[in-house]
């Protein structure tokens, strides 16, 4: 991924040209010729195509301060019924306290259809716009274009006025539909420095900067003695240099979410902005963007986060004394407290950084979101005399946290860190996991420990190895193959299995085996309650040859890799697995009485990138037995786009090879 952060106010025209290609589309200017194309070379299978998506953000004076003015104009061609979703739009407006909030204006939308050679326009009526208060801070406006059918062209435009200079809107040049032209213009007065953060793989066709001179007229109430209002309004006009930045991307392909992706938002072609400093005339530069130490300081003062950790929390004392009774070391103390919180608290939301309830309420109710539960864990560990801190991170589905800039909005999760001796332990009591185990969704890169240094920590999937061991012993009795299956799934597979058994019971887990084997008996799942490690699955089975002249048997039975998870011919963004992997399968098989081996698959050993993985398929006959071993090993979880085809072909080969069969022929 191209990921860059820079103060673009420092960029010279060598990087940003000055040519301004004007937006040529006008609202309502649709001709019959616009309906002629029914598919586009950019994506012949697309259900809708964005013909143009044009946006701008500029500053205007309002009273004694600035407001941001965001404009958008979008035109879309609906190609089939599956593309009807493109006719629905949602706008999110934010509140900033003190009766300040975003306002939408000049909202207009229309659908155009070609009827009898003429363009027929159907406008969106005001009653078709629905407003919903999402929470105390967010309002959603939603509308769906009327009279949409296959071949329709829709368009809408609107303006959003924002009183907050923090609210310079990001722009997505890419989405679920291909786009012929996406363009964004931003005008920034010299009074503000913004950090521009760009990402994505699609290259801009144009990237320009033009410096212009603009005037801003501010109006404010004249003040009398002792700050009293005189009722007289004064105005002052200030001239300023404004840098006009403009990005244009053409023929942008749709970005489709594929298997093994952290979050599509990590890879979409996009640009966003973070206010860094204000520089008003005659005043010193005012830094706005926080630092990691300042972010920590603020978080630990928030009622909705860390303020309770600085208190005595005496209400915990009796319970902690009971829990830690008999503990002989700090690690044993930490384990006892962790197990208690994990086993007795219920998590209501696994994506929340803020605490909605006071710490004491969460402690008493034993219920809360992930941050609330793990903040209780931190508080209890501290109350027990241990050195513990919250850790903030972003889960896989939430996108990456930025390691360079302390952007609080990128984080959505809290875990606990506790040190015992020279060991650091990372704990999450919101899931039924072992001590020092984190859910796979937490392995998403950059995180911060909220200690005095605000230490950076990486939770990389490459560092997480998931191992799976499976063995089958197959013996013959009176012409019937009888087997014993034994498997240690990966730790994360065990977590999922434990949840399935808790919800539906063991019988539901074993039921699919009835379609594979003639008979299944003595099924057990061991270590279900031993959360420190994986479970152990065991069962006996029978496999009838039915006296057939020819018996075809896959040595891996139902454990073979049946399909390639990588379907696309190519991929523009990385493959991001949950972990590195090491899966070993062994079979020791007695050839059934009355049969001989007609054909065995050939053994093979294939390396992935020499030392980054391997596929082993070894099979041999010794006397009346067949020994078989298959191993898939990948030493890393993340693969750049240029390795995608190699990885896809690697799994293609695995699917084909693990699908091969042992052929047994009845003796004459």
Q: Where in the sequence are the language-model features?
A:
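Short coil/turn segments at secondary-structure boundaries
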Residues: 86-90, 198-200, 308-315, 336, ...
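Sec/Tat-exported extracytoplasmic proteins
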Residues: 82, 162, 324, 341-345, ...
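Secondary-structure boundary elements
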Residues: 291-365
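Short His/Asp/Glu-rich catalytic/ion-coordination signatures at enzyme active sites or charged loops
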Residues: 131, 315-319, 362-363, 629-637
């Amino acid at each position: 991924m191209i990921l860059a952060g820079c103060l673009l106010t420092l960029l010279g025209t060598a990087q940003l040209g000055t040519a301004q290609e004007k937006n040529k589309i006008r609202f309502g200017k649709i001709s019959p010729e616009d309906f002629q194309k029914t598919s586009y070379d950019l994506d012949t299978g697309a259900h809708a195509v964005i013909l143009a998506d044009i946006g701008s953000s500029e500053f205007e004076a309002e009273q004694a301060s600035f407001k941001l003015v965001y404009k958008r104009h979008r035109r879309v061609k609906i190609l089939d019924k599956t593309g009807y979703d493109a006719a629905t739009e949602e706008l999110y407006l934010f509140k900033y306290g003190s009766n300040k909030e975003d306002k939408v204006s000049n909202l207009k939308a229309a659908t155009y259809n070609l009827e009898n050679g003429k363009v027929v326009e159907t406008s969106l009526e005001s009653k078709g716009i629905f407003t919903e208060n999402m929470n105390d801070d967010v309002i959603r406006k939603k509308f769906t274009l009327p009279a949409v059918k296959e071949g329709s062209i829709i368009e809408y435009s609107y303006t959003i006025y924002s009183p907050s200079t923090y609210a310079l809107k990001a722009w997505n040049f890419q989405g679920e539909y291909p786009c012929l032209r996406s363009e964004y213009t931003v005008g920034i007065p010299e009074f503000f420095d913004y950090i521009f953060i760009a990402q994505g793989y699609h290259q801009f066709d144009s990237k320009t900067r033009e410096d212009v001179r603009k005037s801003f007229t501010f109006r404010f109430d004249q003040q009398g003695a002792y700050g009293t209002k005189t009722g007289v309004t004064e105005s002052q006009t200030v001239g300023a240099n404004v840098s006009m930045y403009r990005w244009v991307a053409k023929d942008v392909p749709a970005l489709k979410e594929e298997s093994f992706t952290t979050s599509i938002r990590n890879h979409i072609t996009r640009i966003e902005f973070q206010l860094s400093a204000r520089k008003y005339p005659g005043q010193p530069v005012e830094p706005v963007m926080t630092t990691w130490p300042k972010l920590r300081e603020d978080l630990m003062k928030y009622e909705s986060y860390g303020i309770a950790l600085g208190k005595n929390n005496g209400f915990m004392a009796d319970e902690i004394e009971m829990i830690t009774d008999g503990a002989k070391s700090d690690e044993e103390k930490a384990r006892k407290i962790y197990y208690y919180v994990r086993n007795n608290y219920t998590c209501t939301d696994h994506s929340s950084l803020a605490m909605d309830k006071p710490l004491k309420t969460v402690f008493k109710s034993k219920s809360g979101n992930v941050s609330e539960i793990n903040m209780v864990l931190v508080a209890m560990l501290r109350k027990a005399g241990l050195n513990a801190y919250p850790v903030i991170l972003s889960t896989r589905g939430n996108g990456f946290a930025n390691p360079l800039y302390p952007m609080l909005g990128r984080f959505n999760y809290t875990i606990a860190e506790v040190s015992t001796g020279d060991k650091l332990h990372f704990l999450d009591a919101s899931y039924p996991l072992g001590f020092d185990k984190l859910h796979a969704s937490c392995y998403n890169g950059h995180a911060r420990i909220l200690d005095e240094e605000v230490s950076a920590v990486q939770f990389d999937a490459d560092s997480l190895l998931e191992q799976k061991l499976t063995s089958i012993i197959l013996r013959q009795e009176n012409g019937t193959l009888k087997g014993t299956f034994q498997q240690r799934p990966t730790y994360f597979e065990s977590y999922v299995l434990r949840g399935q058994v808790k919800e539906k019971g063991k019988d539901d887990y074993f039921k699919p085996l009835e379609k594979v084997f003639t008979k299944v008996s003595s099924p057990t799942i061991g270590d279900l309650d031993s959360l420190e490690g994986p479970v152990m699955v065991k069962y006996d089975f029978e496999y009838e040859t039915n006296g057939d002249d020819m018996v075809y048997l896959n040595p891996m039975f139902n454990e073979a890799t049946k399909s390639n998870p990588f379907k696309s011919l190519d991929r523009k963004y990385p493959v991001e697995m949950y972990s590195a992997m090491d899966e070993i399968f062994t079979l020791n098989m007695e050839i059934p009485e009355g049969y001989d081996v007609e054909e065995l698959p050939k053994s093979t050993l294939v390396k992935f990138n020499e030392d980054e993985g391997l596929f082993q398929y070894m099979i041999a006959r010794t006397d009346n037995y067949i020994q078989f071993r298959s191993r898939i090993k990948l030493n890393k979880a993340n693969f750049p786009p240029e390795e995608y085809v190699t990885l896809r072909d690697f799994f293609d080969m695995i699917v084909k090879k693990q699908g091969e069969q042992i052929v047994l022929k009845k003796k004459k």
